[in-house]
Swiss-Prot record:
Function summary: May play a role in spermatogenesis.
Chain segments annotated as transmembrane: 22-42
Compartment(s) where it occurs, according to its Swiss-Prot or TrEMBL record: Cytoplasmic vesicle, Secretory vesicle, Acrosome membrane; Cytoplasmic vesicle, Secretory vesicle, Acrosome lumen
Main location: membrane
Domain of life: Eukaryota
Protein name: Spermatogenesis-associated protein 31
Record keywords, A-Z: Cytoplasmic vesicle, Differentiation, Membrane, Spermatogenesis, Transmembrane, Transmembrane helix
UniProt membrane topology term: Single-pass membrane protein
Oligomer and partners: Interacts with ACTB and STX1A and/or STX1B.
One Pfam family it belongs to: FAM75
Region ranges (Disordered): 925-961
Gene Ontology cellular-component annotations: acrosomal lumen; acrosomal membrane
Family of the protein in this entry: Belongs to the SPATA31 family.
Length: 1014
């Protein structure tokens, strides 16, 4: 204590000892600090006079704003004091701006949020009901004006809501982004307080409770007030009634309001139906604002399921749908109210449940509602509320009782559900419609299947398993897929037995098709065919007149045995001869007999007989095709284009008197791997080919005769005297041109007898002239070497291609000595041979031959023009030299030309003549049709002096061409040039050195060429 007085004395003496300037500065500083402190505390002091300290933070900003406005007015008055007129106009504008600004601030959502968040935080329980809470005093107004504040802008409010409704109607702002605030209320008396603001999307944790002497008639209890949520099913709830000894106020229960993530967490109480929640308020010393439900206070809405957190529709709603979403005293006209309610309903339907406008509650949703309602009823019990805010400890206890009232639900939103909906009615109706549609669809498809008008994939599967399914119907065997089909058919018990049976049949066929069907590229190798053939037994046909007995005599064990492999399609072909015992069984492994399903004449096309090539011959006997108990007569080979399968059936011998005299022979043509030819002496000849199915649309109906020919391979079995000869299956050839597919097979092997006959014919030929003999020798040389090339074709690919190229060059030429000569005593083969000879006489023109003829004609004309241009220089000397002196090379014309000279001339001419000779080989088959041209230099032809040149020369002699040139040179001395071979190709002077040498020799011999004549 002693130190403190001494310290004060020292400070006082020090301060007095200072100079006057320092003292003055301290005084000024103290004054400035006091003034600043006054300005800082002035708003607080002014608000403290009219409001409690708890509301200072809400009134500070407006007071500061009004202070600045007053200062601005003072400055403006001083500035405009001189001009009274300008001062009046500015003052009017300023007042209008202030009015508009105040209205906008009152209408702003932030202003109402602040007001709603701080309503009735006062702790005074005896507050005057005629005065508002201090937080309403946001502007510089008197307390009386604040107490009797009225929203006196009904017209402006209506315009504002008109604009909002238009925006909502056109969908400009979304409802979740707009806060519809009912900011305009029209009180009936001046003593009543304004009603609380209704927020459609702005939710606060504390709700307004206004105390007054009388209940405001603006919100009658007969009309509920709805608070709509955007994230869950919405309820139309009525306001709570606070029953007090002196007053009744509309209060909103916090649990009845939904959760909104933008403005905080609220709590909701699940109810079985929309309820009115009247409350009984028992006042103690101090009032409270709101309480939470005890049994749901611990769980926020975020962790609760939407079905459990919100009220769900009752299963049996009543027919009273006259419920308004908006209150009746909402300050908008009736038309705008209806538009707004419709918009809210549409938005709730679209955004809440994501359903269309016509909502049908499913059976699962109803069951879920029942379970949730049962759980909620057990948990929903009356509870107490706890106070919120600063004075929550002094809150009042309120007891809430749940009161059920039917008819207040979301009926208008959900589209007026019936009063007592029958469970399963909609489901039964939908199932019946589905069954009717399915019956009609299956009936149509069954008719198409019966008529054979199914797509390609379905028909292939149907043909693939037709045999096995027929036996399954007769209970001879059971396929593995039968159980699956029966399981699926049990679910389709409403179908007719015929329709169900057809559906099961199609399922079995489709399953087997996907199991058995293989692409043709996999079946290309011959080994795979051989393995499949060796594994399949040969089915013996009973000798009976009925063609259907073969199909029905197959046992069930074979079907089960061949389940993993495609069964054989059988087609019985019976001769029209009197003896019906000789049958020919033709089987193919991918298609089945279509006897039971497809009637004749539905989609069958008459088979057309096309003429074949001479080597294939014709059929001399009539064949009867017994297919699906129908017959059709054909006399020629059944031939298709490349798109269809080709099966050629030749006649078999009907007489049995000379059967033992003939032997069975099997000949396979290897030149075309995709074709197989089988020749049986005295037996039917069967030619089978394998081609790809046509590329057609899957939904395009195809004729039966085309589809039954789409097989993977053919197995030819011939039955004669209980002996069977099995033919190797054909190998599919995919990369073969259409022209080569159309061409028939030509035999490439010959027997010894045919060779002898060809030699005899060759010896008996008449004597030929030198020119014709050279032609014959050249042709015989070419055609004698062709069989050698064809014999080694399978082993050597280059020679195979050469052979095909030669046959393409000569499509009309037949190989001598390779013609089929039947043995004596075989009238059938003789008839076939006669028919072949007749066909040979028919001219055959190919497109390639025609093009080659035109090309050669053009080339010949060009060569003639070029020769004429080369011979024109010698035309001027023709008149001067009538007599030509003997040429120095005349001694070589008699065959005494030196060998060295011939070799010297032959060597350079060989390379040049190769290309020309190749060209001549390609067009040798049309030489007889081309005109033979001879060049004459004199009108009087003379015979050559030396007749020894008429002897035939060896065509294989390499000096033959040079000798012919010498012969032409000798003949040129007599003014005549005759080619040695009339059919010999004229060598091109551009490529052939021999022709250039001949022209050079003619030039040295001073031969004068006259004008050429063609």
């Amino acid at each position: 204590m002693e130190s403190l007085p001494s310290l004060l004395e020292s400070i006082y003496t020090t301060w007095l000892s200072l100079s006057s300037t320092i003292w003055a500065m301290d005084m000024i500083l103290a004054f400035v600090c006091g003034l600043g402190l006054y300005h800082l505390l002035l708003p607080f002091l002014e608000s403290h006079l009219s409001s409690p300290p708890s509301n200072i933070k809400f009134t500070r900003k407006p007071q500061i704003q009004m202070t600045w406005q007053s200062q601005f007015k003072k400055k403006f008055r001083n500035h405009c004091r001189n001009d009274a007129k300008a001062w009046g106009e500015c003052l009017k504008k300023l007042k209008e701006k202030e009015k508009d600004k105040l209205f906008l601030e009152e209408m702003s959502p932030g202003h109402h949020l602040n007001s709603l968040g701080n309503i009735f935080n006062s702790s005074s329980a005896k507050q005057d009901s005629t005065t508002l809470s201090p937080f309403w005093n946001l502007k510089e107004k008197s307390e009386e004006q604040v107490a009797t504040q009225k929203l006196s802008y009904p017209k402006i409010s209506e315009d504002h809501f008109q604009q909002k409704c238009d925006q909502l109607f056109w969908g400009l702002p979304s409802l979740h982004s707009e806060s519809l605030v009912a900011a305009a209320w029209i009180p009936q008396t001046t003593s009543t307080l304004p009603s609380p603001f209704f927020l459609f999307n702005v939710i606060s944790s504390v709700y307004p409770i206004q105390l007054q002497d009388k209940m405001s008639p603006m919100l009658p209890h007969t009309h509920p007030l709805s608070y709509l949520d955007l994230q869950s099913p919405h309820l139309i709830l009525s306001p709570l009634e606070f029953q007090t000894p002196a007053l009744n106020l509309p209060v909103l229960l916090p649990s009845s309001l939904p959760y909104n993530s933008d403005f905080g967490t609220s709590y909701s109480q699940s109810q079985s139906k929309p309820q009115y929640l009247p409350t009984e308020i028992k006042y103690n010393k101090k009032p409270s604002l709101a309480k939470q439900i005890e049994n749901r206070s611990t769980l926020p809405l975020m962790v609760q399921k939407p079905q459990e957190a919100y009220d769900i529709l009752a299963p049996n709603p009543s027919q009273d749908w006259v419920v308004s979403i908006l209150p009746d005293n909402f300050p908008i006209c009736r038309e705008l109210r209806e538009k707004l309610e419709q918009h809210i309903q549409k938005w709730l339907i679209q955004h809440q449940w994501n359903f269309p406008h016509k909502i049908q509650v499913s059976e699962k949703m109803k069951e879920l509602q029942n379970t949730v309602i049962g759980n909620c009823q057990t948990r929903d019990k009356p509870g107490t509320l706890q106070a919120l805010g600063e004075h929550s400890n002094e809150g009042q206890k309120r007891k809430f009782q749940l009161e059920k009232e039917s008819g207040k639900n979301l009926g208008p939103i959900l589209g007026k559900i019936s009063k007592d909906p029958i469970r399963g009615l909609e489901k039964t109706t939908a199932i019946k419609d589905l069954e009717n549609n399915l019956k009609a669809h299956l009936g149509t498809k069954s008719g198409q299947i019966d008529q054979g008008l199914t797509p390609l994939s379905m028909r292939q599967s149907w043909l693939a398993v037709d045999d096995s399914f027929y036996e399954m119907e007769n209970n001879l065997t059971s396929l593995k897929s039968s159980a699956k089909s029966m399981c699926s058919s049990e679910k389709l018990a409403f179908l007719k037995p015929e329709t169900r049976q057809a559906l099961e049949a199609h399922i079995v066929r489709f399953w087997a098709k996907h199991r058995w069907s293989l692409p043709l590229k996999i079946l290309k190798p011959v080994k795979l065919f051989q393995l499949s053939i060796e594994s399949l037994p040969v089915v013996l046909c009973a000798q009976t007149s009925s063609t259907t007995s073969v199909h029905r005599t197959r046992s069930a064990a074979e079907v089960v045995r061949f389940l993993g492999k495609p069964c054989l399609r059988q087609m019985i072909i019976e001769d029209s001869s009197p003896s019906p015992q000789n049958l020919l069984l033709v089987s193919s492994p991918s298609c089945k007999r279509a006897r039971r399903r497809l009637p004749f004449g539905v989609d069958h096309e008459p088979s057309t007989a096309l003429p074949t090539k001479p080597e294939c011959g014709h059929i001399s006997e009539d064949l009867t095709y017994n297919f699906m108990n129908t017959t059709s007569q054909t006399r020629t080979i059944f031939k298709k284009e490349i798109e269809t399968r080709e099966v050629v059936l030749l006649p078999r011998r009907t007489s049995d008197q000379n059967l033992e005299a003939y032997k069975h022979q099997e000949k396979v043509v290897s030149e075309f791997p995709h074709n197989v030819e089988t020749e049986l002496a005295g037996q039917p000849q069967i030619y089978t080919t394998t081609v790809l199915p046509p590329k057609r649309s899957r939904s395009m109906p195809l004729p039966v005769d085309t589809l039954t020919s789409h097989v993977l391979g053919d197995i030819v079995v011939a039955d004669m005297d209980n002996s069977l000869v099995q033919q190797r299956p054909s190998t599919p050839k995919h990369l073969v041109s259409q022209k080569s597919q159309i061409k028939m097979l030509a035999p490439t092997y010959q027997s010894e007898g045919t060779k002898r006959q060809s030699e005899i014919k060759y010896e008996d030929r008449p004597k030929l002239t030198p020119v014709t003999e050279k032609k014959a020798n050249f042709g015989s040389q070419y055609y004698q070497t062709l069989p050698k090339i064809a014999q080694v074709l399978p082993g050597r690919p280059p020679q195979r291609h050469l052979g095909r190229f030669l046959q393409w060059i000569h499509p009309k030429k037949t190989i001598k000595g390779h013609e089929f000569h039947p043995l004596k005593g075989n009238p059938t083969a003789a008839i076939v041979q006669n028919q072949r000879r007749q066909v040979r006489k028919i001219p055959y023109m190919d497109n390639n031959v025609t093009e080659a003829q035109e090309l050669m004609t053009t080339v010949g004309q060009m060569l003639e023009k070029k020769m004429m241009l080369q011979h024109q220089p010698y035309a001027s000397k023709f008149n001067q030299h009538r007599e030509v002196p003997p040429a120095p090379m005349s001694r070589f014309s008699h065959g005494h030309m030196p060998v060295s000279y011939l070799q010297q001339r032959r060597a350079p001419s060989y390379p040049g003549s190769c290309s020309c000779q190749r060209c001549s080989v390609q067009n040798r088959h049309i030489r007889n049709q081309l005109p033979q041209r001879s060049v004459r230099f004199s009108k009087k032809p003379q015979n050559p002096r030396n007749p020894s040149h008429k002897k035939p020369q060896n065509p294989r002699n390499p000096s033959r061409l040079s000798r012919n040139a010498a012969l032409n040179l000798v003949n040129s001395q007599n003014r005549t040039i005759v080619p040695g071979n009339s059919n010999h190709h004229l060598y091109c002077p551009r490529h052939c050195a021999l022709q250039r040498d001949v022209c050079r020799e003619l030039g040295h011999s001073s031969v004068v060429f006259p004008n050429r004549k063609t």
